[in-house]
């Protein structure tokens, strides 16, 4: 996680936000610059990096692992000989779709545009990459707040370490200076990876939500006792008001649904717990604060479990 590699000072605990409604984060500062996050994404969280001093050497670690994955590991994991070029192209296509809910058939179409391979074969390659802890899917949260046709149940695709994705794309840290849109996907992938680690540590679940009305949460962090946070992930502070508005709308949808569900006393519908916290995790924020509406703005440079 970014806390373990030093990009986060760890002064804000996600667990405490959920456990203590009086937990005060206001005024906590982050010293992490956007350029540091560019570098961290390309470097990755590989333990081998910790022993190196030169940044250029640190960036080579992820590239080495990337080559090893498609040249050797994808076959060695279960003893099945797999085509390195198919594996390389699949990693490239997955990287182009990181932190999205792109359909697998579309990801596979990228590969099949240049490689003579079937969907069944590519699916077995994905299984191998999952076993190797290279890629992982985040399940969708599917409460009955909307009709079944409105809720999108597609999984969100992420890399366990986004540095592998960036190695597949051939991207260096300075590239993001002129492409913050791409970094938005990379940053979301990075945050989701950290949240997954925190969820596993605290016996929690990490989900996401999207529906056809535009309602969404980049992450739904759900504790074992039912408490949960709705989380939006943004790079720039200029996107915070939009994220705040989206989270508040989500909370209001849950509230209105519950009000309606309770009106019919003889045949009540499910009532959903309201979120314990609404959180915007921001790459470029230098200070944590709580908005007037109660949304927590957390710089990634402060977050820990």
List where the protein language model places each region:
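Structural motif
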Residues: 227-229, 277
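Short mixed-charge
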Residues: 16-26, 252-277
């Amino acid at each position: 996680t970014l806390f373990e590699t030093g990009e986060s000072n760890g002064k804000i605990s996600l667990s405490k936000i959920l456990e203590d409604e009086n937990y005060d984060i206001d005024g906590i500062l982050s010293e992490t610059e956007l350029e540091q996050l560019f570098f961290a994404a390309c470097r990755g969280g590989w333990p081998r990096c910790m022993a190196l001093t030169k940044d250029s050497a640190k960036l080579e670690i992820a590239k080495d692992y990337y080559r090893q994955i498609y040249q050797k590991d994808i076959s060695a994991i279960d003893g099945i000989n797999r085509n390195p070029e198919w594996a390389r192209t699949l990693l490239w296509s997955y990287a182009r779709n990181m932190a999205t809910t792109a359909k697998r058939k579309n990801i596979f179409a990228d590969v099949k545009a240049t490689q003579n391979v079937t969907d069944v074969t590519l699916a077995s390659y994905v299984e191998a990459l999952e076993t190797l802890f290279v890629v992982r899917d985040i399940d969708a949260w599917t409460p009955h707040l909307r009709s079944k046709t409105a809720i999108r149940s597609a999984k969100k695709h992420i890399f366990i370490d986004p540095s592998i994705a960036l190695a597949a794309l051939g991207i260096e840290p300075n590239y993001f200076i002129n492409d913050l849109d791409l970094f938005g996907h990379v940053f979301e992938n990075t945050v989701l990876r950290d949240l997954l680690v925190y969820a596993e540590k605290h016996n929690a679940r990490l989900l996401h939500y999207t529906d056809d009305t535009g309602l969404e949460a980049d992450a739904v962090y759900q504790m074992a006792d039912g408490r949960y946070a709705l989380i939006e992930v943004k790079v720039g502070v200029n996107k915070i008001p939009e994220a705040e508005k989206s989270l508040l709308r989500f909370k209001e949808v849950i509230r209105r649904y519950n009000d309606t569900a309770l009106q019919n006393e003889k045949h009540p519908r499910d009532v959903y717990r309201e979120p314990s916290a609404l959180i915007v995790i921001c790459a470029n924020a230098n200070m944590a604060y709580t908005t007037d509406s109660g949304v927590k703005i957390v710089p990634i440079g402060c977050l820990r479990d």
